[in-house]
Amino acid sequence: MHVVLPDGKQLELPMGATALDAASAIGPRLAQDALAATANGELVDLMTPLPDGASITLITKKNPGDAAPLFRHSLGHVMSQAVGEYYRAKGYSDDRIKRGVGPSIENGWYQDFDLPEPLREEDLPEIEKIMREILSRNLAFRRREVSKAEGLAQFPHDPYKQELIQGLPDDEPITFYQQGDYVDLCRGPHFPSTGRLPGAFKLMSTSGAYWRGNEKNPILQRVYGVAFASQKELDEYLHQLEEAKRRDHRKLGRELELFTIDPLVGKGLPLWLPNGTVLREELAGFLKEQQFRRGYQGVITPNIGNLELYKTSGHYPYYADGQFNPIEVDDEQYMLKPMNCPHHVRIYASKPRSYRDLPVRLAEFGTVYRYEQSGELNGLTRVRGFTQDDAHLFCRPDQLKKEFLDVLDLTVLVLKTFGMNDVRFRVGTRDPESDKYVGDEANWELAERQILEAVDEVGLPYTIEPGDAAFYGPKLDFVVKDVLGREWQLGTIQVDYNLPERFDISYVGEDGQDHRPIMIHRAPFGSLERFVGILIEHYAGDFPLWLAPRQVMIIPIADRHNEYAEELRSELHAAGLRAEVDDSSNRMQAKVRTAELSKIPVMLIVGDKEQEARQVSVRERSVEGHKERKGVAFDDLCAELLERYRARI
């Protein structure tokens, strides 16, 4: 057999040769430094037989980060071994320690356990200590294949491993990996030995997780760890994590009184508090203004609909698992609205349409409901009830590209208005092997081609993601990177030839015949809840003036200045600005501190001098730090703030 090296040269090897054999054939130093390899683009360990003719790249200690998924997975096994040793030292037998799944994930790994007593967060440093001791033993990772019967016999007291093994094919070998006396069911691959693993790791947290994600199954304890090729990378990651905690929208949402989630109301159903409502309405107002300029018409639809509506659209039963169960009313079935588009189609169909009427652009901030498992709910970014900035455009074929480009322009404008300039674009197309898609083959091909033509025309960088399309049509997603470098999918545009067919809608063309319109789905924010959650973290709660729920705090130095402060508040309020007076008995420094903690962007301090001259001392928060100005004429400042507010800066 032979393998192909990165420089294109072929290396002859005996049949069944491994990556380690390839490294040894090149030279003993390379064999000593090798950690893993890629074969035809897939990571493999050094002991796995290579396919004949495979293109291989050897990964060495000079570039261990290239093998990050391997060393993270191997460290997961080391952690699992350490947990076993920890509980044995406490007097528990091995059959009391049961394990679920333990994959590598982004930046690390997790492992699910069923333990005789729960691990506490304060136990994790001790587990880390045992892990480092296991690394020092330099235990080899050994792969072996066994039959299904042998596999079941390996874990007689572990129902989770038994279930996993029972689900494997009878006629295929089962692979185990072993280091020292620890054995686990695993496909691999792994590092050569524990001594070759990086020491830049940390156990982060524990949580509960249903076995196999099913709420009817037992809750296991999930332990998370992270690992990097170097301590510098780990330190940078931990610093970023601390910054993410500081910006956590759930924490800031409470502190800034933006939203709350009340268990009596229900999980995943946020309540918008007055401050959060202001923020939400500013977002909606901004988009409505843009939509008005572009010829959109507002509509309102109910929060429930007849089940037949969603059967016609195809949302039911295609996404039945993600929707709330139907309810029966007057011998008919209804369900909470999972999407706005079928309702908008019926509005389009409510009267005859001519080619002269098109395009029809219908927009709504419509609340929809999806059933998310409770373990997946997360503040505002994963909820069960949310409001989409939904619009649906109905157009002729000759109008499609122009309408698509206009929607694309609007979405980019929205994102850049909020400082989200690092944007990439993702075109979701069909997976030809999947049967989840509905509609005519020719229409799918046409829609996919026209999306790509539109994106090419504006010169946007993009990737094509097969299988990422909606069930009714291809789409363009906008992926933004926030200040922490995290990527979020915000905004989507979808071309849909399918729903017009399913609902049999039409317009009368110039030829007097009925024609089928093309439909575009569009939501620049995606959902207001998720967008607000991301904005809170993007700005760390320090919103620009126009978005800030509390824009101006007037701070009188003494009680005798309260009347002047209230006069200024009244004038700012009349001008359309959100202003308050802190007339508490606290000292001025304490009032400033309170306003700082509330992240109010503008503070106006007034004392004797300011009152006599109708002036204010200004203290502003900004990303660059604090800016202070003294002796500013109030009328000039009011005009300045109003101009900034209207310009949305």
Swiss-Prot record:
Positions contributing to Zn(2+) binding: C341, H392, H521
Cofactor remark: Binds 1 zinc ion per subunit.
- Its Gene Ontology molecular function terms? ATP binding; metal ion binding; threonine-tRNA ligase activity; tRNA binding
Q: Which Pfam families match?
A: HGTP_anticodon, TGS, tRNA-synt_2b, tRNA_SAD
> Which EC class, in a word?
ligase
Which reactions fall under this protein's catalytic activity?
tRNA(Thr) + L-threonine + ATP = L-threonyl-tRNA(Thr) + AMP + diphosphate + H(+)
User: In terms of domain of life, where is this protein from?
Assistant: Bacteria
Subcellular localization, as worded in the UniProt entry: Cytoplasm
Task: Write down the EC number.
Answer: 6.1.1.3
Q: Which key words tag this protein in UniProt? A: Aminoacyl-tRNA synthetase, ATP-binding, Cytoplasm, Ligase, Metal-binding, Nucleotide-binding, Protein biosynthesis, RNA-binding, tRNA-binding, Zinc
**Main location, first listed in the record:** cytoplasm
Q: GO terms for biological process?
A: threonyl-tRNA aminoacylation
Q: Which InterPro entries match?
A: aa-tRNA-synt_IIb (IPR002314), aa-tRNA-synth_II (IPR006195), aa-tRNA-synth_II/BPL/LPL (IPR045864), Anticodon-bd (IPR004154), Anticodon-bd_dom_sf (IPR036621), Beta-grasp_dom_sf (IPR012675), TGS (IPR004095), TGS-like (IPR012676)
Give the CC-aspect GO terms: cytoplasm
Subunit-level organization: Homodimer.
Instruction: Provide the function of this protein.
Output: Catalyzes the attachment of threonine to tRNA(Thr) in a two-step reaction: L-threonine is first activated by ATP to form Thr-AMP and then transferred to the acceptor end of tRNA(Thr). Also edits incorrectly charged L-seryl-tRNA(Thr).
* The family this protein is said to belong to: Belongs to the class-II aminoacyl-tRNA synthetase family.
- The entry's protein name is Threonine--tRNA ligase
* The species this protein was found in: Deinococcus deserti (strain DSM 17065 / CIP 109153 / LMG 22923 / VCD115)
